[in-house]
Amino acid sequence: DEPLYSNNWNKLMEQREEIVFVASASLREELGGKELTIEELLTQPFFLTEQDNYRRVLNRRLAARRTILTPSLECGDTSLLIRMLEIDRGVSFLPWYAVENSVKEGRLIRLSVEDCYISLYRQIFSHKEKWRTREMDEFVRVAKLADEEE
């Protein structure tokens, strides 16, 4: 999400997440190694998540350019989208942490898209006036450790 703040909250964690365009490795010759425009990408089949935070940001960016995107596949399961990209030809817009291994292993390619660098934030809050349990503190500790490992 975008950075949030309230006088009623304690922000226990905030981690910036880059959201990136990726494509099937089979599109490397056509799309890889160059700066693309969003309009150039729209000719490709898109495999996208349902209307969540990063998809909403992409749709806003497209609307500002008076452009819309109709995905070939829309699914709430990010791992399924990644598998579809790995076996078929398509493009997606996903958090870097979700696609990093597939890109490093050459199963997907990361695309450079002109004027479309987007970051969102993973955040954990607690209410200042409410009790925080040991279990909640442990959850935050584990979440921070997971971020450090990435």
Locate predicted features:
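Acidic, Gly/Pro-rich loop/turn segments at junctions of secondary structure
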Residues: D1-Q44, N53, A98
